[in-house]
Amino acid sequence: MANAQYEKGKIILEYSKNQVKKAGECIRKENGDIDKSIEIIQQYRAAHLYPLMIIKNLVWKHAQKINKNAIIARRLKRLPTIIDKLRRKTLDGKTPNSIAVTRMSDIGGCRVIVENRLELLLLDSSLDKSRTTHNSKVKDYIKNPKQTGYRGIHRIYTCYDKDEAHQWKGFDIEVQLRTKLQHLWATTVEVVDLCEGRSLKTNPFESNPSWIEFFRLMSEFIADEEGFVYLSPHEKNF
């Protein structure tokens, strides 16, 4: 069954990366053959499925050694979300959006949720020591939380980067590592976005400052509870 799933997921990219990049530019500028550009982006998205399955399996083996009850999920970013990301303003609300779709590292992504701080750090360390043909770089939002208060560890895997040639060489897959409380925080942000019509996650600089401050403070208290930071009694009773 697993082998059948792998074979079904082997969707080969039918276009060059340059064609994909130009399709993204066409969509962002809303100039040119939009329908054809969307078709190209859709196929590029689908081609991420096989490398996503490979990376998910790699990460899952490490997670199971840390906690057999760890939760893992994978997804391909929805096409409307990719298009929105190409067209919307940047997160700082100032610089123009010039992102190339071929540089989006989260079209294919998986998330691992572990119990606590220790398990998170052990899993990250285990992945660091992993011998693999895939290169990875780390974005540590534990040491450097986002301005919104988001915390977690992201690992960007460039698939088969150490191989001379491979059909899926160079595809990026993002892996998010979170504790249960960090995941609860992130899920709550998404729920507020949905129910209140906010954009705390995607465009925080255009969102209600009160919500932003609320979630930033909540993140600080959660980080203190889990041992990532220390808040003095004075800071807790601001």
Where are these regions (language model features)?
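Surface-exposed, low-hydrophobicity interaction/linker segments
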Residues: I34-K94
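Short Gly/Thr-rich strand-loop-strand
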Residues: L127, T132-E164
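A short, structural micro-pattern
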Residues: M104-D106, Q147-R151, Q167-F171
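An acidic, glycine-/histidine-flanked metal-binding catalytic module
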Residues: A2-A47, W168-F238
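Residue(s) in the substrate-gating loop at a strand-loop-helix junction
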Residues: V112
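Hydrophobic side chains in well-ordered alpha-helices
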Residues: I55, L120-S126
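Helix N-cap motif at beta-to-alpha junctions
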Residues: E115-E119
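Short, flexible, solvent-exposed loop/turn segments with mixed acidic/basic and small polar residues
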Residues: G93-S105
